[in-house]
Amino acid sequence: MVLSYDGPSVSSAGVSNVACSGSVSLTVVGRGGAGTSGFSGKVRVGATACAGSVWRSDSGVVCRSSSGGITDGAVSVSSGLQHGSVSRAVSYNAPVVSSVGPSNCASSGGLSLTVVGRGGTGWSDISAAASVGVTGCAASVWRSDSGVVCRSSGGIGGGAAVSVSSGVQRGSVSAAVSYDAPSVSSAGASNVASSGAMSVSVCGRGMGVSGPSAVGRVGGSACASSVWRSDSGLVCRAVAGRGRDHGVLASAGVQRGSVSGAVSYNAPSVSSAGASNVASSGGLSVSVVGWGGMGVSGSSAGGRLGLTACEGSGWVSDSAVVCKAPGGVFGGAVGVVSAGVQRGSASL
């Protein structure tokens, strides 16, 4: 006849939540099989053995939990070759984040952020990881069950959440960190052709971390293209325009910075007119030619002969306007072309 002793049977653990730092007493209760003396078996929470186990009776053992970070972990009791368990009995506390300091960091990253909470941030350097927004920190250093130091990655934007994960659990605090907004100190070219297509180096800081993260503007117009160079500079290819003392703006995400009065488009310059003699009755088309600055579209430039505006002005290019001469009696008139508030002239 073969005789077998009942294996351990586990029905419950005394507490369902424990600190991830461990050292919480769990009363493991079952229906026998835990032995008859000081207890030779082991108790485990999840895959980790308890730091210590004290036998109370054939149906009860007190276990001092080890550190951990699981959720819905099984509790098992082994006695000899036999064991029993109950599933989903114990969870370690999830991280709780209460504050982050400092609240501003450079868009280039590299700043140490102290993430403070109320427990649940793990039990060793490898147990907790922090994120700012959707980007993981470049490095996370565990300090205690309630604190982690995070070295921020580069980023843009304001009001980013900070989260700490420990195992499969995580906690976060919203709107905790903002990256510095762009700041523009100067533009590399103070004058650009009204036809555009000129590269303007925009210098400052806080312009993001990659090619598509920053965009430049000259006046009210976005640059034809913006090429990120560093956290402190981008190159903007100016679009066609007119006028003077335009501000230059750089935006990174929803944040922006600008400098005023940085760029002017070249004023019109007039060198010659296509007809040197015009009937006093007017009506003759005169081609007014120059070296640029005459605007960017059909309505951007206007012509004058003498003191009288042309009856009609047709824009041809950045360097030419066709003026329908007004009637008049004058000699050696001055031809004037205006584009916005700027103008150029020549004696014809």
PLM features: residue spans?
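Ser/Thr/Pro-rich low-complexity tracts
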Residues: 1-348
